[in-house]
Swiss-Prot record:
CC terms in the record's Gene Ontology section: cytosol
Gene for this chain: rsmA
Role: Specifically dimethylates two adjacent adenosines (A1518 and A1519) in the loop of a conserved hairpin near the 3'-end of 16S rRNA in the 30S particle. May play a critical role in biogenesis of 30S subunits.
Enzyme Commission number(s) from the entry: 2.1.1.182
Catalytic activity line of the entry: adenosine(1518)/adenosine(1519) in 16S rRNA + 4 S-adenosyl-L-methionine = N(6)-dimethyladenosine(1518)/N(6)-dimethyladenosine(1519) in 16S rRNA + 4 S-adenosyl-L-homocysteine + 4 H(+)
Descriptive protein name: Ribosomal RNA small subunit methyltransferase A
Compartment(s) of residence: Cytoplasm
CDD domains in the cross-refs: AdoMet_MTases
Family of the protein in this entry: Belongs to the class I-like SAM-binding methyltransferase superfamily. rRNA adenine N(6)-methyltransferase family. RsmA subfamily.
UniProt organism field: Halorhodospira halophila (strain DSM 244 / SL1) (Ectothiorhodospira halophila (strain DSM 244 / SL1))
Length: 265
């Protein structure tokens, strides 16, 4: 199924059969599971997934591709024409069990889609996503890592993250200017460290990484008091990239009811 890629959708279609087979092996779909594919494109991954699953739901934004996919794979494939950001995963999850999610996400909207899916982690079994390698570098970065940032902390707060393998630009048409990585995310059950207020945790983490060279004392001024740093056991002279997820949770919880936190919200 040939289709001219649209730049405004950030379309890069997967064409390499060897890469597709590696992805299917990593996903290991089993008949009877409920799986959602985001951005099926030309159906390169859809076809082998359907061979394993029998049925599949896909969401496709491109209104030219959506009906062609439906026609090609009917009745086994259900295509939802629209934006993945407008989709509620809870509505697609089975009554018993959870939803599995697979996707080759457009680089220009990959982070918003990722956070949208993480917000529904309670109904998601796992996610297998093809993303820009630079994004995955940040997702898997450990404390002290050069690429550690807000994305690292918030993704690792919610999930166990594993890079499955890297994918060369030549596996796509048109070939992007960057490498890609295939990544597996498995939501924690239960969370190793649960924040009292997850929106507040995200606010603290975002502020902490607002100035890469700043100490936490400076980047969190007005949000976190000296007393909160002490209560959390966090050095205010440290930099954000050195903190673990657990340390951020302790810090956010300690600051949550402090006067400085209330003033900064």
């Amino acid at each position: 199924m040939s289709h001219r890629p649209r730049k405004r959708f950030g379309q890069n279609f997967l064409r390499d059969p060897a890469v597709i087979q590696r992805m299917v092996t990593a996903i290991a779909p089993r008949e009877g599971e409920t799986l959602l594919e985001i951005g099926p494109g030309e159906g390169a991954l859809t076809e082998p997934l359907l061979a394993r699953l029998g049925t599949l739901t896909a969401v496709e934004l491109d209104r030219d591709l959506a009906p062609r996919l439906q026609e090609r794979f009917a009745p086994a494939l259900r295509v939802i024409e629209g934006d993945a950001l407008a989709l509620d995963p809870a509505e697609l999850a089975p009554a018993q069990g959870r939803l599995r999610v697979v996707g080759n996400l457009p680089y220009n909207v990959s982070t918003p889609i990722l956070f949208h899916l993480l917000a529904a982690a309670d109904v998601i079994e796992d996610l297998h996503l093809l993303l820009q390698r630079e994004v995955v570098d940040r997702m898997v970065a450990p404390p002290g890592g050069k690429t550690r940032g807000r994305l690292s902390v918030m993704v690792q707060y919610r999930c166990r993250v594993e890079r499955c393998f890297n994918v060369p630009a030549g596996a796509f048409f048109p070939a992007p200017k960057v490498m890609s990585s295939f990544v597996r995310l498995v939501p924690h059950r239960p969370l190793p460290a649960r924040a009292q207020d997850e929106a507040w945790l995200q606010e603290v983490v975002t502020a902490a990484f607002g100035g890469r060279r700043k100490t936490l004392r400076n980047s969190l001024k007005g949000l976190v008091t000296a007393q909160a740093f002490e209560a959390a056991g966090v050095d205010p002279g440290a930099r954000a990239e050195t903190l673990s997820v657990e340390a951020f949770v302790r810090l956010a919880d300690a600051a949550r009811s402090a006067p400085a936190a209330a003033a900064g919200r």
